[in-house]
Regions:
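Conserved "right-hand" nucleotidyltransferase catalytic core of DNA-directed polymerases
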Residues: 1-179, 189, 193-195, 202-205, ...
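A generic local secondary-structure boundary/capping motif
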Residues: 185-187
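Signal-transmission/dimerization alpha-helices at domain junctions
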Residues: 211, 215-218
Length: 232
């Protein structure tokens, strides 16, 4: 309450008092209820996926070793660097910013993938390992023992665009574009007798821009259902 006396005049000075009163303020109790309710996770499904991913990682690791002609720690950038640029003789590209040694980051491996299958397989290995460690193995540990749900934290001021962000865990960043990512999403399940309903704005920032600036070409493009990103 003491902060309110300081912050309210600042909101009025900046013309933001109506925004807080009509939009941001009423949103807070909604987010609080969402956080408290949480979301159900099918832990058994994730456990099965973890086992399958572990086997897939092991297969990919063995395939990398066979193609490289040597067994090494695929997770070690140093050892991978030695295999790619010394043993296989591939040309190094960019260097790391800190130590100034040949990089083995994703961009470098993507460049090398056309030259040797090892680089492509390492990319696949890393993606699978990230999904397994970040989501499949981590989510069950975040399930509340009493509610059986995962309870994230939402941040209404976390992004400059006004979009929500979330953390612990970041439920707004669950992958969806790959088959493995979609399988992870399938582990989030609705309450008994309920279904999930998903809706999303299409190009919401540009639509708001068209409304505010009144640009006739931009407005006409939206009304015609055109791809605004291609037009601009």
């Amino acid at each position: 309450l003491r902060l309110a006396g300081v912050l309210e005049p600042r909101l009025r000075e900046r013309g933001l008092d109506a925004l807080y009163r009509d939009v941001d303020g009423p949103l807070l109790p909604v987010l609080a209820r969402m956080e408290a309710r949480g979301i159900r996770v099918d832990v058994a499904r994730l456990a099965a996926m973890s086992g399958e991913m572990a086997e897939a990682l092991d297969r990919t690791r063995r395939e990398i070793h066979a193609l490289a002609g040597v067994a090494f720690n695929v997770d070690s950038p140093k050892q991978l660097r030695e295999v790619l640029f010394e043993k296989l003789g591939l040309a190094p590209g960019r260097k790391t910013a800190k130590s100034r040694v040949a990089s083995t980051d994703a961009a470098t491996l993507e460049d090398l993938a056309a030259e040797h299958a090892v680089a492509r397989l390492v990319l696949e290995y890393r993606e699978l390992a990230k999904l397994k460690g970040t989501y499949v193995d981590a989510l069950p540990r975040l399930v509340h023992p009493e509610t059986g749900r995962v309870h994230t934290s939402y941040h209404p001021t976390g992004a400059a665009t006004g979009r929500l962000s979330s953390s612990d865990p970041n439920l707004q960043n669950i992958p969806a574009r790959t088959p493995a990512g979609r399988r992870i999403r399938s582990a989030f399940v609705p309450a008994d007798g309920c279904v999930f309903l998903a809706s999303d704005y299409s190009q919401v920032e540009l639509r708001v821009l068209a409304h505010l600036c009144g640009d006739p070409e931009l407005t006409a493009a939206f009304r015609a259902g055109e791809d605004v990103h291609r037009l601009t």
